[in-house]
Structure formats: C-alpha cells, structure tokens
C-alpha cells in the first residue's frame, strides 16, 4: 500500500510517515518547502520520498497525486495558527489552505480512486454544554475562522468522496512542532507561578498514538467520521499543566483562572471540547492510551 501524506513537516505528518514505515508501507511525504524541513531526528520521514507541493495550486495537486498514484492520502497539512487566522489580511489565505486546498486534495483522490483521511478538530462545534460531542453530530457552529475553515474542509471531503475518514482531534502534541507541553516546560523554567485556564474542557492527543490509529483505520473500509483523542478522562488546561509539571519534576505553581480572566486570545475558544470516541471501539479499533501515559512517554521522547 502506498500512502501520500501532506504536512510532513508538522507534528502529525512526521509521526504518520514513521508509523507507515514501521509497518512496511511506502509513505511519500509532501509539504511546502523544497525539501523535508521538519525535525532532523534520523527517522524514516527525514529520508523518505518527498515532493514539494502547494496544496492551494489545484493543477499541481492533481498532477502530483496522479503521478504518485497512492492508495490513500492522509491530509495533515493545514493552517493551525488559530489567533492569527482572525486577522482580516490572513483570512483569504486560511481559507485557501484549509478549504480550497482540501477540496483540491479530495478532487485528486476521486480522480485516482484513493481513500482520503482528513484531520479535523473539535473547533467545528460551538463548545456549549457539557455533553461529549458525537462524531456524526451535524450541529456545526464554529466560533472562529479556524473552525469555520476546518468545517469547510470537512464538507469538501464529504461532498466529494465516498471513501473518506474524517478524524477530529483536539489539544495536539508531538515531537515535531510547538504545542502546549513545550510551552509549559519553557515558561515553567522562567516563572515560579503561572495562570492557566480551567473552564475549557477536553482531552489531549499525542500524535505518536494517533498515527498508529490512523494507519489502523486506513487498513479498513470503515469510512465516516471519528473522534480520536487519548483516553484518561476529560480535563481542563489547568489540570493538564499541573500534570505536566508534576511529571517533569517542576515546582512551578499553577493558578486556575477563567477564560475571561485570562484574556489575551483573539479567537474565541470552545469551553466544551469533550469528544465521544466510542465509535472507534464499535468499529473494532483500539482506543488510544491514556493522556497521562502519553505525557510520560512524550517527556521521555523530548529528553
């Protein structure tokens, strides 16, 4: 099986490529840079076949995917700078990448009859209430530009293809990129006390674990919508920060604050990012390990 992976310079794309190699599959990576520009850790992705591609260039996407002729495309590339996406001068570019770029990928998948995996987000929902969001819920009300464009990408995929997996994730962390854990470790070295919000609730997603699940999924034809974060219960960012410092051996004191008290963010964030993942088990997929276990392994990976 040959798999074309977009966004390999990012956290998830990096881990998907390496997971494919560990199972004997051929992964072809792509990103915007002329050559692989992610972390140089000596893993498979750093030397694998790579194609430079601007996903907003419809003709280039079609030609590249027809040439590679993959069985599956795992589409990890996206604009993910949530606050920056609110700037008026950035919004056309955000849409071009997250909506139009995804449409280009979907059109090419249809042309070569490839399965497509689209990575989406809890931000397609409005985050109201306390009940976990179901994967097949269509009550979309994104609160910010990023969420609106990721929803646009979902609709592009579902309206174009029948052989698709839309996988929503949240609170992502991985080796190859910036994330909340790295931020906490950095600021925890500089400050004795920190303020972290305690009214946004969800579950983290370790890209190493998610990559394994995604390869499990593409080995099947169990198409549709899935939610995939680590197990271990729903938590706040405050809870997460406390556990990060505990496991890392930091003495940093964390003070809980509300989102309103914290301020600073341009983009509105959902309060309820609880994602129901029971559909994974119902379809025979193994759930991700607990986020506490994932954090412990990740800290070792960073060491």
Please describe what each predicted stretch is.
Residues 190, 213, 220-265, 271-272:
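Mid/C-terminal beta-alpha module of Rossmann-like enzyme folds, strongest
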Residues 236-242, 258-298, 302:
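Conserved C-terminal active-site "lid" loop/helix of NAD(P)H-dependent oxidoreductases
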Residues 55-97:
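NAD(P)H-binding glycine-rich loop region in Rossmannoid oxidoreductase-like domains
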Residues 1-23:
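N-terminal Rossmann NAD(P)H-binding glycine-rich loop of SDR-like oxidoreductase domains
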């Amino acid at each position: 099986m040959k798999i074309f992976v977009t966004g390999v310079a990012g956290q998830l794309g990096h881990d998907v490529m390496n997971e494919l190699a560990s199972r004997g599959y051929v992964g072809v990576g792509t990103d915007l840079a002329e050559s692989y520009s992610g972390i140089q850790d000596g893993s498979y992705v750093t030397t694998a076949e790579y194609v430079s591609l601007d996903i907003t260039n419809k003709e280039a996407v079609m030609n590249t995917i027809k040439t590679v002729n993959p069985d599956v495309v795992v589409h990890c590339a996206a604009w993910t700078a949530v606050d920056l996406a609110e700037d008026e001068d950035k919004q056309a570019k955000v849409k071009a990448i997250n909506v139009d770029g995804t449409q280009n990928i979907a059109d090419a998948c249809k042309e070569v009859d490839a399965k497509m995996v689209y990575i989406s987000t809890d931000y397609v929902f409005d985050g109201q209430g306390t009940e976990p969001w179901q994967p097949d819920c269509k009550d979309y009300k994104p609160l910010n530009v990023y969420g609106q464009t990721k929803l646009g990408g979902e609709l592009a995929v579902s309206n174009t293809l029948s052989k698709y997996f839309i996988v929503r994730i949240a609170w992502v962390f991985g080796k190859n990129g910036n994330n909340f854990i790295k931020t906490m470790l950095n600021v925890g070295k500089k400050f004795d006390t920190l303020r972290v919000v305690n009214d946004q609730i969800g579950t983290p997603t370790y890209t190493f674990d998610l990559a394994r699940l995604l390869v499990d999924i593409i080995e099947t034809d169990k198409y549709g919508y899935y939610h995939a974060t680590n197990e271990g219960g729903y938590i706040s960012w405050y809870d997460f920060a406390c556990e990060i410092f505990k496991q890392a051996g930091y003495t940093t004191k964390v003070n809980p604050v509300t989102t309103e008290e914290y301020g600073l963010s341009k983009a509105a964030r959902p309060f309820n990012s609880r994602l129901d993942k029971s559909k994974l088990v119902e379809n025979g997929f193994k759930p991700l390990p607990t986020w506490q276990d994932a954090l412990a392994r990740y800290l070792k990976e960073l060491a």
